[in-house]
Amino acid sequence: MTALDTLRGKYIEAIASAADEAALEEVRLAALGKKGEISLKMRELGQMSPEERQTTGAALNRLRDEIDASLRARKQGLADAALDARLKTEWLDVTLPGRPRRAGTIHPVSQVMAELTAIFSDMGFAVAEGPQVESDWFNFDALNIPPEHPARQEHDTFFMARAEGDDRPPHVLRTHTSPVQIRAMQAQGAPIRVIAPGRVYRMDMDQTHTPMFHQVEGLAIDRDISMANLKWVLEEFCRAFFEVPSVELRFRASHFPFTEPSAEVDIRCSWEGGQLRIGEGDGWLEILGSGMVHPKVLAAAGVNPDEWQGFAFGMGIDRIAMLKYGIPDLRAFFESDLRWLRHYGFAALDMPDLAGGLSR
């Protein structure tokens, strides 16, 4: 038996008998450390003849690799044994109930959008969408709001800067969802019935206004449409949305550039104990604006105003959500407060429909 065979037997036995990782590390250092026996023998190769160096060097490399492999295998074996021992002392009762997790809730704005969609879909309205960054033409000119019109200042618009040297009118963050109506008429022509819910932007911030809020606007274009049709649609909407058997609306003459005639719409209500009651009492509450679509708006959208007529209406989604669900501050809608959302939110899978009830 050669000296290397003796060395091999010594360390293979020491590795096999190592009781823990600390003892195994001592064996590794004794064999392969900087001052280990195998490492020292590797240094002696420089003192040997080329023939001896070739033979002994190959044998030492094989021994070193074998010892290293044995060390790794033993280390893994010790780790597996430690894990088995720990698992034998630990146990889990799989019959115990799981930890409760809070279920997510639907934001009131999303809920009200779904309610609006359910109501107007039942009346034959489709949902239309459009870009939130709009051209000056779609947001103003096509809606009978020319550059000199004072309504442009009233909107407190967010204008988007163009590149230096570009003299075209700036794009804007849309101030209403009315541009969607223009795009829908251009794409589909007449007749048409659509609602356009979505985000709009104006530079305003207080308890009842935020720089970004949500609107829904409705449009119906057909032959022989009148204010009577508008009144019926709005009454049916309010009855279904506020979930009351009857409502009474009051139309007050107003002015909007894109409708003629125009009317603000109030709903009969009362306040009792800090709660709003729709359809009863002696009070009136403004909820939306409406009117017959201006002939210039129809013409701008490519619809012949001599052949087609229509009505339009618009309301703030956040506002009617506040009224229906008793939410006092509009700013809370956008503060991402989980406590607020858990209080005012809705069950994720309980989608509103007219048959089962809108809010449950």
UniProtKB/Swiss-Prot annotation:
Q: Which Pfam families match?
A: Phe_tRNA-synt_N (PF02912), tRNA-synt_2d (PF01409)
List the catalytic activities from the record: tRNA(Phe) + L-phenylalanine + ATP = L-phenylalanyl-tRNA(Phe) + AMP + diphosphate + H(+)
List, separated by semicolons, the cofactors it needs.
Mg(2+)
Annotated binding of Mg(2+), by residue: 260
Which residues are listed as membrane-spanning? none
Recorded hits in InterPro entries, A to Z, give: aa-tRNA-synth_II, aa-tRNA-synth_II/BPL/LPL, Phe-tRNA-synth_IIc_asu, Phe-tRNA_ligase_II_N, Phe_tRNA_ligase_alpha1_bac, Phenylalanyl-tRNA_Synthase, tRNA-bd_arm
Task: List, alphabetically, the PROSITE patterns matched.
Answer: AA_TRNA_LIGASE_II (PS50862)
Q: How many and how are cofactors bound here?
A: Binds 2 magnesium ions per tetramer.
Keyword Cell wall biogenesis/degradation (UniProt): no
One GO cellular component term of this record is: cytoplasm
Q: What is its main location?
A: cytoplasm
Enzyme class, spelled out: ligase
- Cell location: Cytoplasm
Q: Output the Gene Ontology terms for molecular function.
A: ATP binding; magnesium ion binding; phenylalanine-tRNA ligase activity; tRNA binding
The record lists its disulfide bonds as none
Instruction: List the GO biological process terms.
Output: phenylalanyl-tRNA aminoacylation
- UniProt key word Protein biosynthesis: yes
What top-level branch of life does the organism fall under?
Answer: Bacteria
Q: What is its EC number?
A: 6.1.1.20
Keywords carried by this UniProt record: Aminoacyl-tRNA synthetase, ATP-binding, Cytoplasm, Ligase, Magnesium, Metal-binding, Nucleotide-binding, Protein biosynthesis
List, alphabetically, the HAMAP family matched: Phe_tRNA_synth_alpha1 (MF_00281)
Q: Which family does it belong to?
A: Belongs to the class-II aminoacyl-tRNA synthetase family. Phe-tRNA synthetase alpha subunit type 1 subfamily.
**How does the annotation summarize its subunit structure?**
Tetramer of two alpha and two beta subunits.
Task: Name the chain's protein.
Answer: Phenylalanine--tRNA ligase alpha subunit
Name the species this protein comes from: Cereibacter sphaeroides (strain KD131 / KCTC 12085) (Rhodobacter sphaeroides)
| Classification lineage | Bacteria, Pseudomonadati, Pseudomonadota, Alphaproteobacteria, Rhodobacterales
Name the gene that codes for it: pheS
